[in-house]
C-alpha cells in the first residue's frame, strides 16, 4: 500500500491497514508531512505522527520533479492500493492522478479521502474536522444545555473518515479484495468527512 495520508483521516486509514498486516509505505514530501511539522523545537516528530505511522515504512518523494514521479510509478507497478487525502485534483495537478496511475497498474485500488467529495457543489471547499462537526450536527448534541455547542473531544470526523476508508466502512479499501472478481480489481474508493459522520 502506498500511503500519501496526511494529518488524521488518511494516516488513520493506513495505520489500520498496517496493523492488519498490510505492507504500507508512507510517502512524505521533502519538508515532511504536516503532522510531523507540528513538532516542538528540537524534536523530529510529534506523538500523534508516531502513533499514526506505526508499522509503516517511510520515504520522501518530490512529486514536483520528474525523478520523484518516476520513482512513484515504479512503486505503483507493484502496489495493490494507493491512498491519499489531498484536496480534489491535487494528484492530477502533480501528474500522478488516477487516470495516469490506472494506466500503469490497471489493478490498482485508488482510495481518496476529501473534505466534501470529488464531485458536487462543495468539492472545492476545504474542510477540517471542526467545521465538519459543526455542519454535520455533531456539535448540536455535545456540550452543556445553557451554553453554545462544543466540539467533540476528539477529531471524530477525521478518525471516522479513516475508519470508513480502511477496514470497516462502506466503500472501503478492503472490499475489492473480498469480491469474487478480485483478480481484475481496480476501483476508486472515495470518502468525504461529512459522509463519515452521517452514515
Briefly describe each language-model feature range.
Residues 172-174, 181-185, 192, 196-199:
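Low-acidity, Ser/Thr- and Arg-rich intrinsically disordered low-complexity segments
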Amino acid at each position: 500500500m502506498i500511503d500519501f495520508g496526511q494529518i488524521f483521516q488518511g494516516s488513520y486509514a493506513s495505520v489500520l491497514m498496517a496493523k492488519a498486516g498490510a505492507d504500507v509505505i508512507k510517502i512524505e514530501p521533502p519538508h515532511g508531512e504536516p503532522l510531523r511539522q507540528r513538532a516542538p523545537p528540537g524534536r523530529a516528530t510529534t506523538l500523534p505522527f508516531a502513533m499514526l505511522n506505526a508499522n509503516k515504512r517511510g520515504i520522501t518523494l518530490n512529486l514536483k520533479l520528474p525523478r520523484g514521479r518516476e520513482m512513484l510509478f515504479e512503486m505503483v507497478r507493484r502496489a495493490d492500493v494507493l491512498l491519499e487525502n489531498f484536496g480534489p485534483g491535487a494528484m492530477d495537478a502533480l501528474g500522478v492522478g488516477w487516470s495516469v496511475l490506472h494506466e500503469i497498474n490497471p489493478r490498482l485500488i485508488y482510495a481518496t479521502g476529501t473534505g466534501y467529495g470529488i464531485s458536487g457543489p462543495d468539492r472545492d471547499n476545504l474542510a477540517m474536522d471542526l467545521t465538519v462537526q459543526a455542519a454535520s450536527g455533531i456539535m448540536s448534541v455535545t456540550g452543556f444545555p445553557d451554553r453554545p455547542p462544543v466540539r467533540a473531544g476528539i477529531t471524530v470526523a477525521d478518525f471516522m473518515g479513516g475508519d470508513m476508508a480502511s477496514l470497516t466502512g462502506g466503500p472501503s479499501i478492503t472490499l475489492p479484495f473480498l469480491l469474487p472478481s478480485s483478480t481484475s480489481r481496480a476501483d476508486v474508493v472515495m470518502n468525504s468527512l461529512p459522509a463519515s459522520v452521517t452514515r
